[in-house]
Amino acid sequence: FILWFGWYGFNGAACTTIEDLGSVFLTTTVSPAIATVTCMVFTWIKYGKPDVSMCLNASLAGLVAITASCDVTDAAGAIVIGIVAGLLVVFGVWLLDYKLHIDDPVGAVAVHMMNGIWGTIAVGLFATSKAPGYAIAIESGAIKAEGLFYGGGFTQLGLQLLGFVSVAAWAAVCMTIVFFVIKATIGLRATEEEEIKGLDICEHGLTSAYAGFELGTAGMPDITYEDVVSVGSESMENSVPAMIKTSDIPDENKITKVEILMKQ
């Protein structure tokens, strides 16, 4: 929500009239709101309850998607842009996580890349002369015509697609070179050991970089890695370090309480 609040300044900073500013604030509100509701309804139907984390990503996706066209589209265009953004982030995360098996724990590709592409294309579909910022955009040469769905034909849509392909090609070439250099020098991925321990402690020497998420040790017994419980056919070296504490409950209850403390 801090991002959402800041997005009004991000999108509205260049406005020169109150009418243009009001229109930008409207579209910047409508698109993420619709994206959030769309994602909530979809995940509610699919999983039986709303996915809060996914819905918050949908809010950000709606903001990303509306940015390119925020000053040249109207509320109707913002609604459609938001609906697509809300669905796109869900299917994008599913595609990356479950089909392509790409490590993207925060859904950045689905939120920013996919919806950035969608938002860029949306200008060629929903740009309208009814928006206060349209005349300024035409005068400055930022756009050439109305969007396809507002009677402008394929002119602006073609320009938006050309812009997308150009940026994608430039980024792909440059970042491929950069990533190969990183891989050949300091390494591109964290080791398996670093992933298990956490990069906060390996890279920065911190138990956790987030307040409230530190490992709690007060009142807990020391757990040493010599105390190992072997489970199944795994070797002792690969077993989970643990301490098992057993305390009896009065005999009349006929049960035994077992507490297992594990340090991961």
Stretches with model-predicted labels:
Residues 1-264:
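Glycine- and aromatic-enriched membrane alpha-helices
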